[in-house]
Amino acid sequence: MGNSINLSILIPLIPMGMALFILILLVSFNRTINRLTKPVSFLLVFSLLVSALISSYLYLKKIEGELFLSNYVKVFESKNLALHINSLNEKIIICFTLIISIGIGVLFFKLPRQKGYVTLLIVISLISSSIIFALMFLDFSVLI
């Protein structure tokens, strides 16, 4: 169980990492990346769905607990920041990532894919990963 709970750190980091990777590519190859809207959309949706898959794995295996960030990042050694992993958090994260993935799919089909489209997707992915981090910092089990 200890190793499985360590997977939970990847839930917000996968979409954030993919968005930052595409942002670096956008800055480096601006014209080319703006033309590649289909692969960018696919990669961002795929990263969100992988996060939902990890969340559903943790939910189905009934893995709960806290993951202290001081174990991973030395900056947080003096702080007691912890990611809370419980069934309610996992349900919320699964629903949220699926809704954002569907939203990106709707944007793909409805919006004209012009110059700011890739930037919009990067911003949506960064905001969604920040919200996932915030959801994991909150302990919803005390509300029940």
PLM region descriptions:
Residues 1-13, 24-122:
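Transmembrane helix-loop-helix hairpins at membrane boundaries of multipass inner-membrane proteins
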Residues 87-88, 128, 138-139:
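Short, well-ordered loop/turn elements at secondary-structure boundaries
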Residues 20-24, 56, 105, 129-136:
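Alpha-helical transmembrane segments of multipass membrane proteins
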Residues 10-15, 91, 133-144:
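Hydrophobic alpha-helical membrane segments of integral membrane proteins
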Residues 115, 124, 141-144:
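Hydrophobic transmembrane helix module of multi-pass membrane transport proteins
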Residues 122-129:
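Well-ordered mid-protein domain cores that form the structural environment of catalytic cofactors
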